Design a protein with these regions (language model features):
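A conserved short alpha-helix in the C-terminal lobe
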Residues: 43-53
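Activation segment of protein kinase catalytic domains
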Residues: 57-65
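C-terminal lobe substrate-recognition/regulatory segment of protein kinase catalytic domains
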Residues: 79-130
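Activation segment/activation loop of eukaryotic-type protein kinase catalytic domains
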Residues: 1-23
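Conserved end of the kinase activation segment
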Residues: 29-41, 55
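Terminal C-lobe "cap" of eukaryotic-type protein kinase domains
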Residues: 119-126, 133-154
């Protein structure tokens, strides 16, 4: 699950390379070239792994390229929250997304729950997922907050 080949110590305010992480687990901040990312990037990846386990899909977001990866995320997470995230931080979508990123509604997690995976999807797990897979990196749970989540009290 971990590739230490690109590991670095984190220093707040430092700009990092966005060409890190395995594509299907990349947080949206990497896909829009936000170079001042932080630990919250790892929590997005944890959410991707959790979703794969819960919904028995590998991976949840399966883009064919970095550009397609953000489109796959938007097809599930919706476009509206992505646009709010961009506006909040004064970010622009890279040019390669022009004409490709449509107005996708957010899909509820219930669309991914079936009889065969229901036993892996208690409400606490769905709530944890909902707080990890968040466009806005500052609104995602931290690792400490995630460990205090009711899911881990089951």
């Amino acid at each position: 699950l971990i590739d230490w080949g690109l590991a670095e110590f984190y220093h707040a305010g430092v700009e990092y390379n966005v060409r890190v992480a395995s594509r299907h687990y990349k947080g949206p901040e990497l896909l829009i070239n936000l170079r001042q990312y932080d630990y919250s990037l790892d929590l997005w990846s944890v959410g991707c792994v959790l979703a794969s386990i819960m919904f028995a899909v590998e991976p949840l977001f399966k883009g064919d390229s970095n550009t397609d990866q953000l489109i796959k995320i938007a097809q599930i997470m919706g476009t509206e929250d992505l646009m709010q995230y961009l506006r909040k931080y004064g970010l622009l979508l890279p040019d390669e997304y022009k004409g490709l990123l449509k107005n996708f509604p957010r899909k509820p997690w219930s669309k991914f729950i079936s009889e065969s995976n229901l036993f892996k999807c208690p409400p606490q797990a769905v709530d944890l997922l909902d707080n990890l897979l968040v466009y806005d990196h500052q609104k995602r749970l931290t690792a400490a907050e995630a460990l205090e989540h009711p899911f881990f009290k089951l």
